[in-house]
């Protein structure tokens, strides 16, 4: 399983081609051919779903080829793209998130009065950028993928053009995102200067031949880390996340908090387990400090929030801290733990935000904690699903969230990071407290709005699927653990 197979370049690129073609087709049709806003709704059925279906089919073909041929990876474009278990694992996560968000957006955009075709086009183009982040093994490929994804999210965060907070969030995200990309580009330029190549394999060998405490190597590590830590909203580069999560359409917040975070972690793992692997003595103490600060700020700030989206934003920040612990451990259990965590986090976080989407109705924004009051009495199904998602986010068995935290904590114990494991456990207790605020509001609070929550068939399907997966992964984890095991970088 250690051999390489260099295929027809287009075989590797087919998923990205499908996403780009359908995404651009939607943008062109929306601009020139479909001026009627009511007809734009059908772009979802005619272009988005077929585009995602063809993307899924091409990923399945790549996965089948790897299984049948016995090769460990497929390379293309002289090593700039690599399809392996790692890339396929993350690309399936991106596809699932894009599919769920697209399905639930149909009715949500009706309520917001913002049915514009570019919404769906940007979802597909953002996923195209994510494909390059998971598959890229070249600095140029990775940077192009990152910027394509980021540019799409800058626009989607500000999609509610009539709302000041949406415009403000997009502007903050754009400015800070561009600033972080500058740091990342500077770090990449140093990598190129050290190695004379943009290929990750060549850079890894060149950096390994140098002293980890060489000032040039340390500067490369520091600037690259700043850019990467911003993308996963780690402290102290997290300032954009609460505003972006609150200001964006809730469906986009769900997409940003799951698919974008997964893509950013795929990027981070490619770099830290590749070019920066030999510099571990320099970055490990810094990453420990960042992880502790991220868990601290994320969990403590969430306690004071009255807006559900901001609360979940700080929760998302704290989860980034937990995932960083797996990288700090650095063993196979830790990296597997990150993969498992990202998989389960996708379903439980999507589900939590979809409940907020369900609360949104004409005249009711549905984002305050008080909007959950009495939900058990008027819409028990939604309350039970939200309970499942919150228990999973807190890491309570038998939900999937427990599995993710278990492997992260196990990796810390295996590598002797006992104090980190204790600190992380204490912050789990803090998280249980603020998640319980939402549970108490749903089950004990008095309903301010007596009418039951109504939603589209697509939203109900997405919520049910997310809830089932959140429980299934926790109760019967074996196939999902095998799936995550195949994602380990060789």
Label for each model-derived stretch:
Residues 1-490:
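Alpha-helical transmembrane segments of multi-pass membrane proteins predominantly involved
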């Amino acid at each position: 399983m250690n051999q390489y197979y260099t295929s027809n370049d287009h075989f590797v690129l087919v998923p990205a081609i499908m996403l780009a073609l359908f995404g651009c087709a939607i943008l062109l049709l929306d601009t020139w051919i479909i001026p009627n806003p009511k007809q734009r709704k059908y772009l979802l059925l005619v272009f988005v779903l077929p585009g995602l279906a063809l993307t899924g089919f091409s990923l399945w073909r790549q996965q089948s080829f790897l299984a049948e041929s016995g090769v460990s990876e497929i390379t293309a474009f002289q090593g700039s793209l690599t399809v392996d278990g790692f890339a396929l694992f993350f690309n399936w996560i991106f596809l699932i998130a894009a599919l769920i968000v697209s399905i639930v957006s149909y009715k949500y955009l009706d309520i917001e009065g913002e049915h514009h075709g570019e919404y769906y086009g940007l979802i597909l183009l953002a996923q195209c950028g994510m494909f390059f982040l998971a598959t890229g093994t070249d600095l140029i490929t990775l940077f192009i993928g990152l910027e394509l994804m980021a540019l799409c999210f800058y626009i989607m965060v500000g999609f509610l053009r009539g709302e000041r907070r949406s415009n403000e969030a997009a502007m903050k995200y754009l400015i800070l995102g561009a600033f972080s990309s500058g740091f990342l580009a500077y770090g990449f330029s140093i990598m190129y200067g050290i190695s004379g190549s943009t290929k990750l394999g060549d850079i890894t060998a060149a950096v390994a031949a140098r002293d980890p405490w060489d000032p040039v190597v340390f500067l490369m590590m520091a600037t690259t880390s700043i850019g990467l830590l911003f993308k996963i909203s780690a402290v102290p580069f997290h300032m954009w996340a609460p505003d972006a999560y609150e200001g964006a359409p809730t469906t986009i917040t769900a997409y940003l908090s799951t698919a974008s975070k997964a893509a950013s972690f795929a990027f981070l793992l490619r770099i830290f387990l590749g070019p920066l692997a030999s510099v571990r003595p320099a970055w490990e103490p810094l990453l420990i400090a960042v992880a502790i600060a991220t868990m601290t700020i994320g969990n403590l700030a969430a306690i004071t929030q009255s807006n559900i989206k901001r609360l979940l934003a700080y929760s998302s920040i704290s989860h980034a801290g937990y995932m960083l612990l797996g990288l700090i451990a650095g063993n196979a259990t830790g990296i597997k733990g990150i993969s498992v965590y990202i998989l389960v986090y996708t379903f439980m976080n999507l589900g939590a935000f979809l409940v907020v989407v369900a609360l949104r109705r004409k005249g009711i924004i549905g984002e305050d904690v008080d909007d959950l009051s009495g939900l058990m009495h008027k819409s028990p199904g939604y309350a039970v699903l939200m309970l499942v998602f919150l228990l999973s986010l807190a890491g309570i068995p038998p939900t999937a969230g427990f599995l993710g935290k278990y492997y992260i904590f196990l990796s810390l114990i295996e590598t002797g990071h006992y104090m980190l494991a204790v600190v992380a456990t204490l912050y789990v207790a803090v998280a249980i407290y603020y998640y319980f605020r939402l549970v108490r509001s749903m089950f004990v609070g008095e309903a301010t709005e007596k009418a039951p929550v109504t939603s589209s068939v697509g939203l109900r399907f997405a919520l049910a699927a997310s809830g089932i997966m959140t429980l299934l992964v926790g109760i019967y984890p074996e196939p999902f653990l095998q799936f995550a095991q195949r994602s380990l970088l060789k």
